[in-house]
Every structure is written in C-alpha cells, then in structure tokens.
C-alpha cells in the first residue's frame, strides 16, 4: 500500500523524536556513570538501550514498507553468522544499505552491537547519529593523515568488546551513482585498472588498516553483495515512509581472516579482486538474471520491532492524552505555539534524516582522494 509520505512524517517524526531523545538521554546517563568504571557493562547496557531506537527503523523496513530480502548463503556461513565477530564488506548501491545491514544484524541477535566506519558528519545527525556515537561507531574525516590514528584507536577499543559484533565497512567510500561510476571508469583508464560497470573502485587503505589491526580477534570477513531485485523500485527512506515495498537480493560469503595475505599490498589487492568479482556477478545478474549459485533463504520479519513500536506508541498516546488534559486547563497561545513548534521540529528532524540518506547528497567521487586511498 502506497500512501503520501507526508501523512506519516508527523506521527512517526513525533514518535521517533520523543523516543530518540529518551534513548539518547539514557545513553548519556550510563556513559557518564557506568562507562568510566566498566566499559564492558556500559556496552551491554547500551546494546539494549540503542535497540529501543533502532528497532523502530527495522519496523519501518519490515512491517510498514514490507521490504523482502532474499538471502543467498551457504549452510556453514548461515550457521556461524551472529556467533562470531566479523568485518562486513559490502558494495554500496542504495540509500538504505546501512539499514539492510541492521535488519540482518537484528535477525541474528547483534543489532545493538553492530558497528560501522562512517563519515564524521553522521555523528551530528539528530537522534540517530548521537546514538551511534554512544555505541562506539568509528567516524572519519576522509583525510588519511587524520583518519589513520582514528582507525587504529577505534579498532583497539574493540579488542575487549564483550558481545558478538559486526563491523561494517563500505570501501567504495560513497554510494553508487552513474556520475560516480563515470568518474571511477575515467580513473581506471588513467591507472590501467579494470573498468568497473556496477561497482566503484574500492579505497583500500582503510580496509588494509582494519585487517591488520583486528585480524587477531576477528575471525571472519562477511563478503556481501547486494542489489535490488530486477524490476523492483530502489528502496529509499522516503519510499519506505510511503509504504512502498521492494525486494533485495543479498549474497553473503564468509572468508577466514587467517587466509588473507599478510602484506599490506596483498590485502589491498585481495580487496580489489573481490570487487572485480562483485562487478562480474552484478553484470551477470543484470544481463542474464542469474544472481548467485548459493541456496536462497527467505528472511522472515520478526515480531520484536512491532512490539517495541507498539509500546512506544502507547507511551506517546498516553503522554499526549495527559498533555491535552493539561492544555485544556492552562491553554494559552504561548502553550499552543510551543506545541506547534515541537511538531515542526519533529518534521524537520525526519526531513534531515531522509535527506542525509539520499545518494544525490552523498560525497561525490573525487579522483585525488581516491588516489590517496587506493594502493598503487
């Protein structure tokens, strides 16, 4: 069912803003009073607190937009996911690839302990960015001189992580668009690299740093290749708010970290070869409608996100009822104006989150930066 997204903005915006601020405040309190004494206990508490917010987006994906995921994976990998630390390496084709990762993490019980390496602007996003900062996400400035130490410090903090975690890394550095593809093809021509058709050229320095620093305590890399099912609309947050469904094909392959090369150049080449393989796989799918030779599994939607949203909604309705009772007693133009201002803030917050996810607003491909991050 497709409905005008504007009709959903205000109620969902109010719900997300109120619940998000509550979650952020709780995170702040535990960050101040627990983390200085026990980082392990803080992380366990924060996992459950953060999920109270993040599950609302899972609900939007699963229950409101009813987006379907076809998971292609072998039996051995399916048995291990969610039971071991992993570095998740994926291509970056849509505005909600990060949310697809959250959906998969939620299915295997590690949503609240899922992590990612992101651009620093993300941590300033209202509600969601703040929750990520409290959850040990690693934020980069896209300047290797500054980011090298940031990455090493971030990886060091993960050594004693008390729960199974997934660390996501989008090595293409930006979302796939036709404009960025053309820039990548031009760069490939200059550097005598294979010309990509369906992926961008990976920026390998961050990946090399990750493998070098975490291979002693992270046993696996989950190699994810995803794309929208043929003839389905590309999912976006705006389309999700409209209740517009879609279908995602996701392949997961597990690589043992111990089997990766030991040298930096070898690790970088391994990453580049991996994306050449992804490119060929996607080309085969787009031309022959054959996505993967692995067994496909249907990912059923869980009940937990729905329960969390219902509880938050009940809290909001009860609070709104009490507010209306209070307004009927002390009603004045100032109070009414304050109420309207709050609704406007909720709407603006949702608009900021939606715009921040749009591929048109992501960082454009820059060959000088790419040249810094791709090993020669």
UniProtKB/Swiss-Prot annotation:
Converts lysophosphatidic acid (LPA) into phosphatidic acid by incorporating acyl moiety at the 2 position. Has preference for C-18-CoA substrates compared to C-16-CoA substrates. It catalyses: a 1-acyl-sn-glycero-3-phosphate + an acyl-CoA = a 1,2-diacyl-sn-glycero-3-phosphate + CoA. It comes from Arabidopsis thaliana. One of its GO terms (biological process) is CDP-diacylglycerol biosynthetic process. The chain crosses the membrane at residues 14-34, 49-69, 98-118, 306-326, 335-355. The keyword Lyase does not apply. InterPro entries: Acyltransf_C, Plipid/glycerol_acylTrfase. This is 1-acyl-sn-glycerol-3-phosphate acyltransferase 3.
